[in-house]
Amino acid sequence: MIARADQSFKYLRLLSEQFPTQQAVFTEIINLQAILNLPKGTEHFMSDLHGEYEAFLHILNNCSGVVREHVDDIFGDELSEEEKGDLCTLIYYPHEKLALAHLQHIATPSWYKVMLERLLVVARSLSSRYTRSKVRKAIPRDYAYIIDELLHTHPDENNYRVRYHERIIASILETDAGEDFICSLSDLIKRLVIDHLHLVGDIFDRGGGASKIMDRLMEYHSLDIQWGNHDLLWMGAAAGQPACIITVLRNNLRYGNFEILENDYGISLRELVAFAERTYQPVAPNATGFTAKLTPMAKAINVLLFKLEGQVIMRHPDFDMEDRLLLGKIDRDYGTVVLDDGLPHKLATNDFPTVDPGHPYELTDEEQALVDRLVEEFTSSGHLRRHIEFLYSRGSMYLARNRNLLFHGCVPMNEDGTFSSMSCLGTWRSGRDYLDFCDEIARRAWRERDEDSLDWMWYLWIGMKSPASGRLVKTFERSYIDDPSCWVEPMDPYFELTKDEAICDAIMAEFGMPSGSGHIVNGHTPVHTAEGERPIRANGRLLVIDGGFCSAYHPKTGIAGYTLISSSRGCRLKAHQAFESVEAVLTRNADIVSETDRFDVAERRRMVSDTDTGVQIREQISDLRALLEAYRTGTLEERP
């Protein structure tokens, strides 16, 4: 019998408020036991979106081809390839497909009826994997009752029930509600196909659609995010870290995406443009290639960046980045800089009017005023703040879930396979302890905005021992030296060592994961498929799913991105070809072509009981059994 002063008694008393009778407890235990024996929900893994909104949206809508697989399985030869393609496109883009159907004058009542019935067949098939309660919660609220009724039509029902359901369909069409129901069913199908989305970092930069991606993610039903270095950069910028802000500007200048700053986030660059034009020399009319890129805007941003980075590096000797203090090593007489190789390298420009050779990292008064204004612009953008708050609420440095360990970049390592130590505000940390520190310091930066934590946001973006970066980034060399041999960026030993299954096992063990099973899932480093690289490494223990969403990387990677599907039947890696356009999908059913690589095939279907959710459910059942015992023994009274 439980003592009334016991903590467990207090917990059971609270639990009894939710389940006040034995019957209520019985019902919940039966429900939870049933859930344990359902197939696990399908998990969808994506990484390194880099602002490619249309490609991201299509893969989100087609669920990496899983929607088409279900349509093929359900209808087989009953429908032609064109009919199945039309149905899939309707599921992907219901509003756009309906608008096109009207333009083509095919949106007749009979067309609506056929499409509604086909969508219902797909939705019924998918809903059989879940409890009715979960399906009801997934149905758009406005039509929950009617769609729930339609989903539970069975071929063996009596004629009265069949006529009842036929009458519902007829009423939908008579009241011109067909479009709303088609859109609602299409959304429901996509929610039932994918139970949960894992986004393994790097939403921002390169492509111009990061703001749209964030808006869409904020509407998604279930997801988590593992922060990438580009995400952490924007998080630092939104918190007001000056070097992060200038780096964001540099990245968007490089890819021609200032619209995301000015139009999406309302950040004015007018003062920066004016400052650059009056301070720096214009590009020479005969300039080509590398030097043609050194516009006044580029030169202004570069100098601001290297001054601000230099200040951070000098504040933090523990970052061990003194080799990046190159602005002060410029020989203005010869227009050269001496790098670590001890040799002078010719600079593509000698236009440094605001750099004081005696104090190279000090901002001029005009530069300081400009930086202060940019900090104000970034920290006062409401739209950006909402996006960053969402990144914090759904994101983390890493996630251990369902036998998988997810993080964007690396766990810093030494050449001998041990975890590399990093001085973290006076304490040396390594492995999981270090990633936990990085997670906390990132949250502190947003919460407290103190200089130390903000400077760490910059380090997490660029540092050699940053788990989100893991390489020696050579921004200065890439900005000023027209010699690709100077641009080589050494990588953390992690990226080579994790080709070894034993190293992957050691990393999994460090994070409390079971040995000999599961996977490490990374993004960050594009898989050069065209050069023979493979995303499945270390005998399947490491999966690298950055296949190059960014269109600029397609020639290097040979594909347009990898995604991962983990279902009750095992894992599948999807290699996607480039996305053509939404218009091509609508007019020609031009879906993304994807190759599937099956691995970790389940000998028996994986059920909810085999997942982390299953562990939680069994704990709930144990608590409910204790509550039931308390009712039976009289320790707690029922409240009918």
Region annotations inferred by a language model:
Residues 1-640:
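Feature recognizes metal-dependent phosphohydrolase scaffolds
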